[in-house]
A protein has these predicted regions:
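Cell-envelope/extracellular polymer assembly enzymes that use nucleotide-activated donors
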Residues: 40-42, 73
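Donor nucleotide-sugar binding loop of glycosyltransferases
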Residues: 50-53, 81, 110, 136
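Short, well-formed alpha-helical segments that are part of the catalytic scaffolds
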Residues: 50-65
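Short beta-strand/loop segment that forms part of the nucleotide-sugar
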Residues: 70-81, 102-103
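A conserved acidic beta->alpha catalytic loop
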Residues: 78-87, 133-134
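Acceptor/aglycone-binding surface of glycosyltransferases and processive sugar-polymer synthases
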Residues: 100-106, 110-120, 125, 137-214, ...
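Acidic helix N-cap motif at the loop->helix transition within catalytic regions
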Residues: 52-56, 83-92
């Protein structure tokens, strides 16, 4: 039987989310049965102050998984939220054996949260999505099939029609054009939160700093060159407000690109 564990982070026990000098180790984990299991999909959700969306999002994912008879886990990584996100994540993980919850001591950033989720992911295919419900879980089956049937190393979503203000969409277009030219990878939406990977891809890369923007480039540098793209739905934000700024985000992204 599955047994729940709620513990203080112990590097000797798990070491799931750290590299040598990384100080962003989780404070708490709610995890079921840490013996590795064979499963189809791990859904990794980095989150920061998204308490309003979590029950609805996880229920939607569960419906999609059940309808398609997938074996799966949902890994929610709370990046130091100051709202009720952790309490909700903890409750959801006790109510559903498929949900695992991890909490950071403070806000370390999306890259750290993704890296932590990647290190814990057990599924043959790892799918990432944002917690704000602007990514649709209904995209999961098609992304899974592209990895498994067409043998892609990773698939990046492309939000071709967006519901963002121009202060965000214009810098995003400039960023993507620059990333395409620099890397030679012909993607339209490098930073789309909705992506799918073979498990071995996420286990072969280290996502740190602000490098979540460049995961396709990191994967390519690690030898995974079959990278595809799928047009995905971009849903209008239902709860809360965006956590990102337009011009600052673009400038930081360009500086990170120069460091790769």
């Amino acid at each position: 039987p599955l047994q729940k564990h709620s513990i203080k982070y112990s590097p000797d026990l798990f070491s799931p989310c750290s590299w040598q000098d990384y100080s962003g180790a989780p404070e708490k984990m709610n995890l079921f049965n840490r013996n590795f299991q064979i499963m189809d999909i791990s859904v990794v959700i980095p989150l920061y102050n998204e308490d309003e969306s979590l029950p609805e999002l996880t229920a939607w994912i569960e419906r999609v998984m059940a309808a398609n008879h997938f074996t799966y886990e949902i890994i929610m990584v709370d990046d130091g939220s100051s709202d009720n996100s952790w309490a909700l994540s903890e409750t959801l993980s006790t109510q559903n054996e498929h949900i695992r919850a991890i909490k950071f001591r403070r806000n370390y950033g999306k890259s750290a949260a993704l890296h932590c989720g990647f290190q814990n992911a057990q599924g043959d295919v790892v799918i990432t999505m944002d917690a704000d419900m602007q990514d649709s879980p209904d995209e999961i089956p098609a992304l899974y099939q592209m990895i498994m049937s067409e043998d892609y190393d990773m698939i990046s979503g492309w939000k071709k029609k967006r519901f963002d203000p121009k202060s965000k969409t214009i810098p995003t277009k400039l960023f993507n054009a620059t990333a395409r030219k620099f890397s030679g990878i012909h993607l339209h939406d490098f930073n789309c939160g909705l992506k799918a990977y073979k498990n071995k891809v996420v286990k072969s890369i280290e996502v740190y700093g602000e490098m979540h923007r460049y995961i396709p480039i990191l994967a390519q540098q690690a030898g995974f060159t079959k990278i595809g793209e799928k047009v995905v739905q971009h849903r209008a934000r239902k709860y809360g407000v965006t956590k990102f700024g337009g011009l600052n985000r673009f400038i930081n992204g360009m500086l990170d690109l120069l460091s790769i």
